[in-house]
From Swiss-Prot:
Coiled coil: none
Keyword Zinc on entry: no
Designated name of the protein: X polypeptide
Similarity-based family: Belongs to the IagB/IpgF/P19 family.
Keywords: Plasmid
Gene designation per UniProt: X
Domain of life of the native organism: Bacteria
Length: 169
């Protein structure tokens, strides 16, 4: 019994370590602070690789970064299927980083773009409030991650450039 428990624990630890490296790699490749990706993943799934979250409008989100099912047709063109997103942590993290990079390209490196990762780009007051609430939650998680590493974050809710430059220090 103890051997089985040890084997299960080692598999779980291996998966977490593997995913941790992927935050760093995806952050490097998409030029996004890996800790921001970690903060989004914590907000979206509490770091659960196989998480499924119901979205009443578009269907559901999959995996660590809760990649929305509305993107599945596009992802299928690249050979990514829904099962990959709940079984391959790196695939999920890279896919989430890809969609966050799209938001940054569209709206700049702003907290509004972080909010759009979850609430979309529709320009209505309701969506704006949803983006703000989401970005505020991610910001709190992000500053907690940075604080645990002894890094102070400038107080801002508007722009990420100063924060993203922290990763280079």
């Amino acid at each position: 019994m103890k051997k089985w428990m040890l084997a299960i624990c080692l598999m779980f630890i291996n998966e977490i370590c593997h995913a941790t490296d992927c935050f760093d790699l995806a952050g490097r490749d998409y030029k996004i602070d890996p800790d921001l990706l970690r903060a989004i993943s914590w907000k979206e799934s509490r770091y659960r690789v196989n998480a499924i979250g119901i979205n009443p409008v578009t269907g559901y989100g999959s995996g660590l970064m809760q990649v929305d099912s509305q993107h599945f047709n596009e992802l299928a063109r690249y050979g990514i299927n829904p099962e990959h997103l709940t079984t391959d942590p790196c695939m999920n993290i890279y896919t989430g980083a890809y969609y966050l990079a799209i938001a940054f390209k569209k709206w700049g490196i702003t907290w509004e773009a972080v909010g759009a990762y979850n609430a979309g780009f529709r320009k209505t007051e309701r969506q704006n409030q949803r983006r703000l609430a989401y970005a505020s939650d991610v910001y709190r998680i992000y500053t907690g991650i940075k604080s645990s590493k002894g890094i102070r974050i400038p107080v801002t809710k508007k722009s990420l450039p100063e924060i993203n430059s922290v990763q280079n220090n």
